[in-house]
Amino acid sequence: MSPECAQTTGPGPSHTLDQVNRTHFPFFSDVKGDHRLVLSVVETTVLGLIFVVSLLGNVCALVLVARRRRRGATASLVLNLFCADLLFTSAIPLVLVVRWTEAWLLGPVVCHLLFYVMTMSGSVTILTLAAVSLERMVCIVRLRRGLSGPGRRTQAALLAFIWGYSALAALPLCILFRVVPQRLPGGDQEIPICTLDWPNRIGEISWDVFFVTLNFLVPGLVIVISYSKILQITKASRKRLTLSLAYSESHQIRVSQQDYRLFRTLFLLMVSFFIMWSPIIITILLILIQNFRQDLVIWPSLFFWVVAFTFANSALNPILYNMSLFRNEWRKIFCCFFFPEKGAIFTDTSVRRNDLSVISS
């Protein structure tokens, strides 16, 4: 008996035959049939629009936040959020290439890195939102006790932890994504696809449960608890906080309004994240279940549109943030571009008001 026959029929590991006959999920590879051109144009238009809006929005938001004279922990975390969004949407051109070619022609290196970078940046986003909510709660407690905020070293350590943990948590995807030949439904021959190839089901289940719990459910719980605590503190001690601040009455009102506006903006960012990331988390879990139930069918086109919906969150974040906190800056840019004379007047009257923003606390 040849070694090959012995490998498939002998008393070897039980998962060897399963791996040979296993059908892998093709992710972005798909055979679209007769409507390939129309579908590809629609997909390109949608993702192209998301990419442009995300790129312009996040870059503008980065510039507006970075130009602040004083930047505290919240500002650093918000900058980190925009950087993660830019990294996440950087995968869009590669996704579009695969949607046009159908087969994976980008090579094994890109296959290893594409889903790794997307997963890592998504993890950075949710952890950053959790850190922002926690920092806001701590900031209010410190304000009541007259304590200063975290220093630059603490902020740098927090950002390093977020990126380091996210990189390690997503590392199995970098290792286990590989290019394999497979015949897709609607195709007449095998084509190369980039897919996730776990050595065994136990490892796949363990990682899925670990990642969803620690990178989605736990940060979500932290966000809910933090914002609930913020609301509780705000309602219970709003009058006492206003009376105890060592500022003029008008300045107290301004800071309170800005703090409420920042809280509302960050809350909207959190809500939009969970709404727009929950479908992809559910889809990934369904792909795992598909390994055990062959009657459960998940089409690559469905996966693509779920990912496109998730990409849209990176375009929505800077829009929500800019519209809520940088209305004056955008009015100034608009006036300076179209009405230079009014823009100069608006600039002079808005400098002091901009410097009072709570984001620098």
UniProtKB/Swiss-Prot annotation:
Induction summary: Up-regulated in response to high-fat diet in adipose tissue macrophages and in hepatic Kupffer cells. Up-regulated in response to either short- or long-term cold exposure in brown adipose tissue and inguinal white adipose tissue. Up-regulated by ADRB3 agonist.
Q: List Phosphothreonine occurrences by residue.
A: T347, T349
Query: Which keywords are on file for this protein?
Result: Cell membrane, Cell projection, Differentiation, Disulfide bond, Endosome, G-protein coupled receptor, Glycoprotein, Inflammatory response, Lipid-binding, Lysosome, Membrane, Phosphoprotein, Receptor, Transducer, Transmembrane, Transmembrane helix
What parts of the sequence cross the membrane? 46-66, 78-98, 104-124, 157-177, 205-225, 269-289, 296-316
**Subcellular location, record wording:** Cell membrane; Endosome membrane; Lysosome membrane; Cell projection, Cilium membrane
GO BP terms:
adenylate cyclase-activating G protein-coupled receptor signaling pathway; brown fat cell differentiation; fat cell differentiation; G protein-coupled receptor signaling pathway; ghrelin secretion; hormone secretion; inflammatory response; negative regulation of apoptotic process
Q: Which residues lie on this side of the membrane: Cytoplasmic?
A: 67-77, 125-156, 226-268, 317-361
Give one Pfam hit by family name. Answer: 7tm_1
Q: Which parts form a coiled-coil structure per UniProt?
A: none
Q: Which cysteines are joined by disulfide bonds?
A: C111-C194
Known glycosylation sites: N21
Task: Tell me what topology the record assigns in the membrane.
Answer: Multi-pass membrane protein
Instruction: PTM Phosphoserine: list the residues.
Output: S350, S357, S360, S361
- Spell out the post-translational modification annotation for this entry: Phosphorylated at two clusters of Ser and Thr residues located in the intracellular C-terminus, a prerequisite for FFAR4 internalization via an ARRB2-dependent pathway.
Ranges facing Extracellular side:
1-45, 99-103, 178-204, 290-295
How is expression of this protein distributed across tissues?
Highly expressed in brown and white adipose tissue. Expressed in perivascular ciliated preadipocytes (at protein level). Expressed in the taste buds of the circumvallate and fungiform papillae, mainly in type II cells (at protein level). Abundant expression is detected in the gastrointestinal tract. Highly expressed in lung and pituitary gland. Expressed in enteroendocrine K cells of the upper small intestine. Expressed in alpha and delta cells of pancreatic islets. Expressed in pro-inflammatory CD11C-positive macrophages. Also expressed in spleen.
Q: How does it assemble?
A: Interacts (via C-terminus) with ARRB2 following LCFAs stimulation.
Member of which family?
A: Belongs to the G-protein coupled receptor 1 family.
Function as written in the Swiss-Prot or TrEMBL entry = G-protein-coupled receptor for long-chain fatty acids (LCFAs) with a major role in adipogenesis, energy metabolism and inflammation. Signals via G-protein and beta-arrestin pathways. LCFAs sensing initiates activation of phosphoinositidase C-linked G proteins GNAQ and GNA11 (G(q)/G(11)), inducing a variety of cellular responses via second messenger pathways such as intracellular calcium mobilization, modulation of cyclic adenosine monophosphate (cAMP) production, and mitogen-activated protein kinases (MAPKs).
Q: Under what name is this protein listed?
A: Free fatty acid receptor 4
Q: Which organism is it from?
A: Mus musculus
Name the gene behind this protein.
Answer: Ffar4
